[in-house]
């Protein structure tokens, strides 16, 4: 299988997000890379599902709480940016303070 660098990045994000979902389901608090992957994958899927940029940006602030992540992680993530594929093309989505 030949993948572009962008496709490899998406696959890596998805794999890390899957691991984060499983750990969260077991009641473990997510660390920094797990939280980033979890939120990023959810944003990419929401865009693919046809939500607007504004809806995806708002959705990104509802995915995790401080109780879902290790201490200090929310402060390490002031914003998340992801190039997501929407029905009308690829757009940059920025979510400020994704873990309120």
Curated annotation (Swiss-Prot):
The keyword Oxidoreductase does not apply. InterPro entries: Urease_gamma (IPR012010), Urease_gamma/gamma-beta_su (IPR002026), Urease_gamma_sf (IPR036463), Urease_subunit (IPR050069). Its EC number is 3.5.1.5. Pathway: Nitrogen metabolism; urea degradation; CO(2) and NH(3) from urea (urease route): step 1/1. This is Urease subunit gamma. HAMAP family: Urease_gamma. It comes from Paraburkholderia phytofirmans (strain DSM 17436 / LMG 22146 / PsJN) (Burkholderia phytofirmans). NCBIfam families: PRK13241.1, urease_gam. Signal peptide: none annotated. The keyword Hydrolase applies. Belongs to the urease gamma subunit family. One of its GO terms (molecular function) is urease activity. It catalyses: urea + 2 H2O + H(+) = hydrogencarbonate + 2 NH4(+). Keywords: Cytoplasm, Hydrolase.
């Amino acid at each position: 299988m030949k993948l572009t660098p962008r496709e490899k990045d998406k696959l890596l994000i998805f794999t890390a997000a899957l691991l984060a979902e499983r750990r969260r389901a077991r009641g473990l608090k997510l660390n920094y890379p797990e939280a980033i992957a979890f939120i990023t994958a959810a944003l990419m899927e929401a865009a693919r599902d046809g939500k607007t940029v504004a809806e995806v940006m708002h959705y990104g602030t509802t995915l995790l709480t401080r109780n879902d992540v290790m201490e200090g992680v929310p402060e390490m993530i002031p914003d998340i940016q992801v190039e997501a594929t929407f029905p009308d093309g690829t757009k940059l989505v920025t979510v400020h303070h994704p873990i309120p």
